[in-house]
Amino acid sequence: MDVQIEASWKAVLKNEFTKPYFLEIVTHLKTEKAGGKTIYPPGSLIFNAFNQTHFDKVSVVLLGQDPYHNPGQAHGLSFSVPNGVKPPPSLMNIYKEIQSDIGIAMPAAYGNLTKWAEQGVLLLNAMLTVRANEPGSHQKIGWMNFTDTVIKKISDEKEGVVFLLWGRFAQDKQVLIDETKHQVLKAAHPSPLSAHNGFFGCRHFSKTNDYLVKQGKPPIDWKLLTP
């Protein structure tokens, strides 16, 4: 089947698109939509993370769980929201840690992280879709087979990538990563429920750039400006 995904990723993942589990994902989504269910993000944005960050450009992977499930929030990038949408609490806590870590003031009314994606930060959710107002509703339809493969491909075929694993769910993916040639940084999830248990003070943004510079790669400019 012809999946609308950026060319470098299509080449890397081409074998996945014909596997039974992937065809089942497609069937599941079509069935839910035909039954009147609203699914986020919109179809054209399901692979937005891949379209914004080409495979050869990936230098950081920021792993989320599933897309935001409220109207207008999800646009295919983990933790990110479109222009005009107020940053959710987890993203506000990410901003607080950036300011504490590297002294950059972040825009309280702006949560679009596309600028990070364009620099090589793959903003990957483990599940690429969700039913409206039902968090975790697509956890068992097969997406994790796909995104686990994505993580493994990055680990196997690239070197010197930073994997940011926040919270237990993300940290369970550590087994997919070859830590002899990549950097894994772990912390609590930035959710208000857990940020004080080890996310605040983790300094992952400066640590990421320190590692990238040592690898001879450009550091990430984390600063965001309200358009």
Where are each of the predicted segments found?
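Generic N-terminal amphipathic, Lys/Arg-enriched alpha-helix
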Residues: 1-13
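C-terminal substrate-binding/active-site "lid" region of AdoMet-derived donor-dependent transferases
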Residues: 199
